[in-house]
């Protein structure tokens, strides 16, 4: 799952949920109890679906993070001096940036 796909998926889920909740709020004053219960059950169902899908997306992101960490670990184990050099370079850059403040 690519980063762009994940971001778009999250946006679509949140928009769907907010649209459903907006419908509930905007129509609550003019509907009967039966209609309100239908709208409420629709909102609850949308919330459950969004939680499930967002949970799946979170799991996919966690898996991608584990894979990236494993690749970085493997690279550093195969090229330890390169890893030390990268760490030192990052330290120098951060030191310079922090010393300017």
UniProtKB/Swiss-Prot annotation:
Alphabetical keyword list: Cell inner membrane, Cell membrane, Membrane, Transmembrane, Transmembrane helix
Its biological purpose: Upon overexpression inhibits growth.
Subunit structure: Binds to 70S and 100S ribosomes, probably via the 30S subunit.
Gene: yqjD
Induction or repression: Maximally expressed after 2 days growth, i.e. during stationary phase (at protein level). Expression is regulated by RpoS.
Family the entry assigns: Belongs to the ElaB/YgaM/YqjD family.
Main localization, broad class: membrane
Membrane topology term: Single-pass membrane protein
Gene Ontology MF terms in the entry: ribosomal small subunit binding
InterPro entries listed in its UniProt record: DUF883_C, DUF883_N, YqjD/ElaB
Cell compartments where the protein resides: Cell inner membrane
Superkingdom of origin: Bacteria
Effects seen without this gene: Not essential (in strain K12 / BW25113).
Organism whose genome encodes this protein: Escherichia coli (strain K12)
Stretches for region Required for binding to 30S subunits in vitro: 1-12
Name recorded for this polypeptide: Uncharacterized protein YqjD
GO CC annotations on file: cell pole; plasma membrane
Transmembrane segments annotated in the record for this chain: 81-98
Lineage summary: Bacteria, Pseudomonadati, Pseudomonadota, Gammaproteobacteria, Enterobacterales
């Amino acid at each position: 799952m690519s980063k762009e796909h994940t971001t778009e998926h999250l946006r679509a889920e949140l928009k769907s949920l907010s649209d459903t909740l907006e419908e509930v709020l905007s129509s609550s004053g003019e509907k009967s109890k039966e209609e309100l219960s239908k709208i409420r059950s629709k909102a609850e169902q949308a919330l459950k679906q969004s939680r499930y899908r967002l949970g799946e997306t979170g799991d996919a992101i966690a898996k991608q993070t584990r894979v990236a960490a494993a690749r970085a670990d493997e690279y550093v184990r195969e090229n330890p001096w390169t890893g030390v050099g990268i760490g030192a370079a990052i330290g120098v850059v951060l030191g310079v940036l922090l010393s300017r403040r």
